[in-house]
Design a protein with these regions (language model features):
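Hydrophobic micro-sites
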Residues: 182-232
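Hydrophobic residues in beta-strands of the RecA-like P-loop NTPase core, especially within AAA+ ATPase
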Residues: 145-146, 200
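Hydrophobic positions on the alpha1 helix immediately C-terminal to the Walker A/P-loop
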Residues: 48-49, 53
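Helical hairpin unit composed of two closely spaced alpha helices linked by a short loop
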Residues: 59-65
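P-loop/Walker-type NTP enzyme "switch/lid" segment
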Residues: 2-17, 21-22, 28, 39-44, ...
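Inter-motif core of Ras-like GTPase G domains
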Residues: 139, 153-174
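G-domain G4 guanine-recognition motif of GTPases
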Residues: 6, 40, 171-175, 198-208
């Protein structure tokens, strides 16, 4: 659900804006232009987070590129109800240009869907063309948000995490277990990923706490809350 667009005054929309602000503040010592969103496993809400974060950044006046880098099971196009006939995979394969494949959803938000599912997603995402594409995008957009596959499922997020400035890990209390979340964190740390924070979804708000273990919690509706690391 695109709550930032459909319910702009809801608590959860404000939570995404807070996440946006925290990411911006985390760039005080280092540029935080390329941001990877992933999860430990499927169904945890990483694509929903990517889309709403992109909307929140765009509404603040920043130029944003949202990339669907889940070349195995893309979903960004479904959330925005746009075509996925051509996209990132086609651009990287040299079949089309970015300008022809991208969609300007609003004045500040540009979306590049995943495109045709390739036979070699990991190789495509780790290619020199992908690195060159991201480098070119940095010269055009203030923020580039990459919606990546789940960490434990495939190696794609680990590959992409070496190309970005920061990683946000999405974890669902109703889907992921503690060990899966820990394993995802370990896999990212093994490639020296810069994990700047996490988003915790589907939480029982009856047992919520304002502070816990060095994390801030931001509560929203529909049993969802966003959590962000304190200063590291």
């Amino acid at each position: 659900m695109l709550v930032v667009k459909d319910k702009p005054k809801s608590p959860i929309s404000e939570a995404y804006r807070t996440l946006r602000s925290n990411i911006q503040f985390s760039s005080f010592d280092k540029d935080m232009q390329l941001i990877l969103i992933t999860s430990s496993g499927p169904g945890e809400g990483k694509s929903t987070t990517s889309c709403n974060l992109a909307l929140a950044m765009a509404e603040a006046g920043s130029s944003v590129l949202l990339l669907d880098c889940d070349l195995r099971k893309p979903s960004v196009h479904k959330k925005f109800k746009i075509s996925n006939n051509i996209g990132l995979s086609n651009v990287l394969a040299g079949q089309t240009k970015f300008e022809s494949a991208s969609h300007w959803y609003s004045q500040n938000l540009c979306i590049l869907t995943a495109g045709k599912i390739p036979p070699n997603p990991a190789e495509m995402l780790s290619s020199k063309r992908m690195k060159a594409f991201l480098n070119e995008a940095k010269g055009v957009f203030k923020y580039i948000i990459l919606d990546a596959p789940p960490v434990i499922a495939v190696t794609d997020p680990q590959i992409l995490s070496t190309m970005v400035d920061g990683v946000v890990l999405v974890v669902s209390s109703g889907v992921a277990d503690i060990e899966a979340a820990k394993r995802a964190k370990e896999l990212l740390e093994n490639v020296n990923a810069n994990i700047i924070g996490s988003v915790l979804n589907r939480v029982d708000t009856e047992s919520r706490r304002g502070y816990y273990g060095g994390y801030y919690y931001y509560y929203g509706d529909e049993g969802e809350k966003v959590k962000k690391h304190k200063d590291r």
